[in-house]
Amino acid sequence: MKGIAVFLVFIFCWTTSTLSSFWQFQRMVKHITGRSAFFSYYGYGCYCGLGGRGIPVDATDRCCWAHDCCYHKLKEYGCQPILNAYQFAIVNGTVTCGCTMGGGCLCGQKACECDKLSVYCFKENLATYEKTFKQLFPTRPQCGRDKLHC
């Protein structure tokens, strides 16, 4: 019974950190662009969402490619940007990144900076967002197999 309790606490903590990072990015996208990250950007083009590859289809997709590259660089430094939680504030449309207490603080702050650049890029390219590039279940056959290097 004690083993199950320890396991459940571990799963809760891992899930909370994963979801918190996920939700932080979602909230940032919503505040800055006015759009839902999931319904507007997940599955957009060749790089928005999981498993990016090919040539970005437009400026919005290039935002996602740059975000992937930013996260990739953090991983090279030993960070886990999807898991490293962070704090942010938005005042007059300006995002300010901070970090939560505990391990991964610097990595969390750097992940926030990646997310911040991405949402500003999304906002800058709202006028050229093309709904036909958004797929609910992205298979991305038009993207090819090769991944664009950072």
Curated annotation (Swiss-Prot):
Cellular compartment(s): Secreted
Q: Name one GO molecular function term.
A: calcium ion binding
Q: List the disulfide bonds.
A: C46-C143, C48-C64, C63-C121, C69-C150, C70-C114, C79-C107, C97-C112, C99-C105
Q: Where are the transmembrane segments?
A: none
* Keyword Calcium recorded: yes
Q: Where does Ca(2+) bind?
A: Y47, G49, G51, D68
Which Gene Ontology BP terms does the record give? Answer: arachidonate secretion; lipid catabolic process; phosphatidylcholine metabolic process; phosphatidylglycerol metabolic process
**InterPro entries attached here?**
PLipase_A2 (IPR001211), PLipase_A2_Asp_AS (IPR033112), PLipase_A2_dom (IPR016090), PLipase_A2_dom_sf (IPR036444), PLipase_A2_His_AS (IPR033113)
* Cofactors, names only: Ca(2+)
| Catalytic activity field | a 1,2-diacyl-sn-glycero-3-phosphocholine + H2O = a 1-acyl-sn-glycero-3-phosphocholine + a fatty acid + H(+)
The entry sums up its family as follows: Belongs to the phospholipase A2 family.
- Indicate what this protein is called per its UniProt record: Group IIC secretory phospholipase A2
Gene name of the encoded protein: Pla2g2c
